[in-house]
Amino acid sequence: MTAGQATRIGELLGVPVTSVRTAGAQHGYQHLTARLADGRQAFAKAAPGGDEATAEAFAAEANGLRWLAEAGAVPLPRVLGVSRDLLVIELLPDGRATQDAAEEFGAGLARMHAAGAASFGAPWPGYLASLPLDNTPGTEWGSWYAEQRLVPYLKKAHDDGALDDADLSLVETVVNRIGELAGPPEPPSRIHGDLWAGNVLWSGGRGWLIDPAAHGGHRETDLAMLALFGAPHLERIMRGYTGTAPLADGWRARVPLHQLHPLLVHACLFGGSYAAQVRAAARVLLTGS
């Protein structure tokens, strides 16, 4: 199996592969590490016999990595090659998160957000794990977020039985009140879009972004997701961020709003074990407690 994958990677990159190892799997993709004949090391996501959805997902991730890197604010691995069945990026050596690196990462994240986007959404179809994201451009964040980040996943989670009728009604109330909950208008920011702690790789004394669902979005979305799944040294990340780009008044009260989308996605992917968190986030938004 790995011999065939080594051949495919070598063909894609135009460089022979001297060794390849499996490195687990996630969302139906095989993870591989490879050493190239020119001395470079690479990480690959592989989907043997990839279909149209796989091709779109790999293209979206490659586009996102390149687009975020254009800001020159936070380091990202270089895209070495992308095809219908492979995404290959540079392999980064493992490091550890330090407080200073976390603060520097927060400042860089603020600068990346400030690089902006042409609109909310993106020119390419999006994916989050195995789920498609509608990146149709919009000009007003609240309605865009409600219609393209909340409603589709609320419906799927309910249809799949992960959320019950009461949960559906509760989140629909949030959607209907999005205008008052969304906060003051902000221009589209250049955001990662899936910024849980596992998508920050600490290497060489810096925080690197990997595996984005990049698009023009609200900058508070990335910060809320870092908080949702426990980023290391979060206080220092926030210090670096707010010291570079202060947040609008009331941002803490909006954290559950920005967390609703990833919670709904997790309910779609993993089932009803996330229903209580969806419910809690919606209730805090509607009642303040």
Regions of interest found by a model, annotated:
Residues 14-21:
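Conserved N-terminal boundary motif of the eukaryotic protein kinase catalytic domain
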Residues 256-264:
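Hydrophobic alpha-helical segments that form the core
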Residues 72, 113-120, 157, 182, ...:
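A general structural signal marking secondary-structure boundaries and capping sites
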Residues 266-289:
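ATP/Mg2+ or Mg2+-diphosphate-binding catalytic cores
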Residues 22-143:
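ATP-binding pocket architecture of kinase catalytic cores
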Residues 2-10, 117-190:
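An alpha-helical support segment within catalytic cores of ATP-dependent transferases
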Residues 58, 102-105, 167, 171, ...:
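Hydrophobic packing residues in well-ordered alpha-helices of helical domains and bundles
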Residues 139-146, 155, 186-190, 197-256, ...:
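Active-site Asp-x-Gly
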